[in-house]
């Protein structure tokens, strides 16, 4: 029956997810071990030593990010974390998040266009929302080809604020879009082959407990556009 099919599908996704995460953990560990062994053997130039050290640091950061996302998502789903909502300026946060990734988009010669209003106040957990926008901007950079374009736009819409992150990357088909926010989903497009299926699941969960929402429009080869909606605070005189 339908329930059995759904349980079977979930179990399959879970098994695929565990296998994928195991691979994701092994990959940076293998890199770190290989480059650390080369450094220990010696005989490298200063430039090579710096390059190897930077590679180890990048692999370590990738592993740390993945483990952090697993722990955060687990705590959110088990309701061990509740939002600590307080008023803050979303526009400033978006600027800060974008600048955090500036070196990455410049390295790929990406045209990063930020269209932000001067100031908009929201009542939310600032640290949690930082996870949302860092994930979306990071993904856009990751999946946008060199010389491509990314648009970060924020506008007020009635009692809401709408944030859009659009890219000119590989895009997704309908099947992938339907399940891109599922925790265990590993789609067939390059949007889901890179990474471990955690970032967007974490983004959606954070927004759900914050009274917000996220949606996506996309097509293969035409890029993707993620739209976040959050309730905004009334403007004061």
Residue map of PLM features:
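Short alpha-helical segment of the dimerization/phosphotransfer core of two-component systems
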Residues: 58-64
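Conserved catalytic submotifs in the C-terminal HATPase_c
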Residues: 84-89, 106, 111-121
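Short acidic helix/loop segment immediately C-terminal to the autophosphorylated histidine
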Residues: 40-47
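Short conserved segment of the HATPase_c
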Residues: 172-184, 204
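Conserved glycine-rich
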Residues: 211-212
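Short helix-loop "hinge" at the ATP-lid/N-box region of the Bergerat-fold HATPase_c
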Residues: 140-141
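Short beta-strand/loop element within the Bergerat-fold HATPase_c
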Residues: 147-159
């Amino acid at each position: 029956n339908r329930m059995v099919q759904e349980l079977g599908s979930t179990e399959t996704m879970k098994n695929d997810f565990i296998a994928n995460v195991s691979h994701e953990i092994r990959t940076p560990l293998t890199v770190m071990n290989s480059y650390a062994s080369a450094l220990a053997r010696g005989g490298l130039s200063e430039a090579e030593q710096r390059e190897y050290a930077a590679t180890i640091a990048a692999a370590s950061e990738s592993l740390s990010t993945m483990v952090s996302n697993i722990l955060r998502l687990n705590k959110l789903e088990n309701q061990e974390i509740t939002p600590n909502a307080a008023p803050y300026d979303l526009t400033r946060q978006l600027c800060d998040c974008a600048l955090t990734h500036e070196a990455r988009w410049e390295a790929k010669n990406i045209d990063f266009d930020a269209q932000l209003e001067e100031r908009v106040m929201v009542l939310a957990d600032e640290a949690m929302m930082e996870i949302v926008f860092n994930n979306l901007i990071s993904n856009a950079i990751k999946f946008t080809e060199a010389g491509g374009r990314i648009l970060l736009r924020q506008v007020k819409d009635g009692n809401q604020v709408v944030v859009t992150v659009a890219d000119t990357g590989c895009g997704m088909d309908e099947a992938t879009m339907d399940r891109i926010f599922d925790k265990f989903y590993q789609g067939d497009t390059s949007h889901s082959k890179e990474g471990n299926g955690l970032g967007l699941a974490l983004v959606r969960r954070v927004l759900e407990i914050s009274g917000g929402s996220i949606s996506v429009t996309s097509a293969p080869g035409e890029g993707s556009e993620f739209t976040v909606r959050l309730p905004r605070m009334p403007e004061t005189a």
